[in-house]
Regions:
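A short helix/loop element that forms part of the nucleotide-sugar donor recognition site in Leloir-type
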Residues: 180-196, 343
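Donor nucleotide-sugar binding/catalytic pocket of nucleotide-sugar-dependent glycosyltransferases
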Residues: 140-184
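Conserved acidic donor-binding segment of nucleotide-sugar-dependent glycosyltransferases
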Residues: 315-316, 320-327, 336-341
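A conserved, positively charged/aromatic
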Residues: 118-146, 161
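A conserved mid-protein helix/loop that constitutes part of the nucleotide-sugar donor-binding site
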Residues: 22-32, 201-227, 241-248, 320, ...
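Short hydrophobic beta-strand element within catalytic cores of glycosyltransferases
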Residues: 46-48, 300-303, 313
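Aromatic "clamp/platform" in nucleotide-sugar-dependent glycosyltransferases that forms part
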Residues: 264, 283
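A short, well-ordered alpha-helix in the C-terminal region of glycosyltransferases
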Residues: 192, 329, 336, 343-357, ...
């Protein structure tokens, strides 16, 4: 790489949206990462292992150029195409996200003597059986790792067999220049468009519609809450594989009038400013980007005590927290906040203050420093 002006990096992920999802959380991260890398020092390319999917169109519309492998997770043709891309674009290092990407990327890196970074983004209940074999073979030889939270780092060390001294925790954060405070009139008008007046209480959940995200539990809590506060509603933002089932589940319980599905929204950072409380009832998470957004706009937060959420939030200070699946405690917390204006105000202020610790440019800077350290090691 002697004499090169820039370091060529290939970011390889599993997919941008997954099944029935417009945009995955990882893809949303790429949307703000890619334009912010220092182009005088780095040429960063973005590739999906799975290929073109529903979310790729959103990525392209945002101005990103994409590459694809286009084969199944364990299809060896991934390796052949990846090697071609590495050679064609003179790639210096690979930054890998996800099982398939991590498998073929590490093999290609070993064959071509290219360094790789494994980036852990979530905690799973178990590693697929075939992947366990892969991780036992490749994990101990992984030299560079990043994790979105300390719990994800621990997961990578325990289940992916990556040496504990190579995994660095780097919180994603959020670019503050993408947060635009909305006026009181705008928020009032938007709520009105969705049938909510100024006295209605809006609870919000943002994210992929998956069974483990806790949407049903939040709706069960809403049923309890409406016995005391009948004008409380939930807005659900996002799409995903659980969408049809969740719609049917809500309809079967006669809740269609108080659970509003807004689908995938590009203006999510504006809409969440209309919430009275933002809910994070997941059973597992890495550190959701939606949590960084909620902090940045100063929302009152109620969250399950899982993984990265438990790291970022402090119960009773920056959020009220509960054990995942505890519907009664979730309902109690919501009622307490809605019935105690000074508590809501305190949570909002603490949320905004906590967000100052998660400037997204710190994440970019940390990644760029790692790229340069790896590059320097290659020259020795």
């Amino acid at each position: 790489m002697t004499g090169k002006k820039t370091i060529n990096v290939l970011q390889l992920c599993e997919h941008f949206g997954g099944k029935e999802s417009q945009l995955h959380g990882v893809a949303r991260t790429f949307q703000w990462w890619m334009p912010r890398f220092d182009r005088s020092r780095f040429n960063v390319l973005l590739c999906s292992r799975k290929g073109y999917d529903k979310a790729a169109e959103q990525m392209i519309q945002s101005g990103l150029s994409l590459l694809y492998l286009g084969y199944g997770k364990y299809d060896p043709r991934n390796l052949l195409k990846l090697i071609r891309l590495i050679r064609e674009h003179d790639i210096d290092l690979l930054h890998l996200h996800g099982y398939g990407a991590g498998t073929w990327g590490r093999i290609a890196g070993a064959l071509l003597h290219k360094p790789v970074i494994i980036h852990g983004r979530g905690n799973y209940h178990s590693v697929p059986p075939l992947q366990r074999i892969v991780e036992r073979l490749l994990g101990p030889h992984t030299r560079y790792g990043l994790a979105v939270s300390a719990s994800t780092r621990d997961y990578m060390v325990k289940h992916w067999h990556i040496p504990d001294n190579v995994v660095q925790v780097v919180y994603n954060g959020i670019p503050f220049d993408d947060i635009h405070p909305m006026s009181a009139d705008w928020k009032l008008n938007f709520r009105r468009e969705l049938g909510c007046g100024p006295d209605d209480r809006v609870l919000g959940i943002v994210g992929r519609l998956e069974s483990f995200k806790g949407h049903r539990e939040a709706c069960c809590a809403l049923q309890q809450i409406r016995k005391v506060i009948p004008n409380a509603v939930i807005w659900v933002l996002g799409d995903g594989v659980f969408e049809k089932e969740l719609h049917a589940w809500v309809a079967e319980r006669g809740m269609a009038d108080c659970v509003k599905f807004l689908g995938f929204r590009r203006d999510v950072r504006e809409i969440i400013q209309c919430f009275d409380i933002q809910l994070f009832p997941s059973y597992r998470e890495g550190t959701p980007n939606t949590l960084y957004e909620a902090l940045a706009v100063g929302n009152a937060i109620i969250a399950s005590r899982v993984d990265g959420q438990a790291e970022l939030l402090e119960d009773g200070k920056t959020a009220l927290m509960f054990e995942a699946g505890d519907v009664d405690k979730l309902a109690q917390h919501i009622l307490r906040v809605l019935q105690t204006p000074e508590l809501m105000t305190a949570l909002q202020a603490a949320s905004k203050m906590r967000s100052e610790d998660f400037d997204g440019m710190r994440c970019i800077d940390a990644i760029q420093r790692l790229y340069e350290r790896i590059n320097a090691n290659l020259k020795k």
